[in-house]
Amino acid sequence: MARYDLHHAKSPLEVSIVTGQGAEIVEFTTNEALTAGDWVGLDTSQSNEDRVTQVVQGNADGMVIGVALETVASGAVVRVCVSGYVEGAKTDGNVAAAGDTLIPAASGAVTKGAATNVLPILGMALEVDAGSDPYYADVYIYRRF
């Protein structure tokens, strides 16, 4: 069952990615290994309520809900930021500026949105992404879950 932890009740020392004071964190069971910074989505391969209590690495679809805050193995409980500030969220290397809207991309990443996109906006970039595949950026997540 997903467990809510509103208003960032977890100590910042308990998660590997820094979140802001108003961040909302929910615990889910994961059905595959995840890396801190991966965007995650609801696991629609499950049935009944398990579809909203279990997550997998996000893909370019409308099921993505937040960012994994820790690296975990398949079957573990993972804390996911579903709203607010997150440092080091995975991108596909196309985030060009602070303020870019973010939509789901493949392999647990997000990409810069465009006017023609039909995927949901997940949040906005607070900086240009950095690194070399995988890329990361600080983001603000809009609540969807």
Language model feature labels by segment:
Residues 1-145:
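Surface-exposed, low-hydrophobicity beta-strand/loop segments enriched in small/polar/acidic residues
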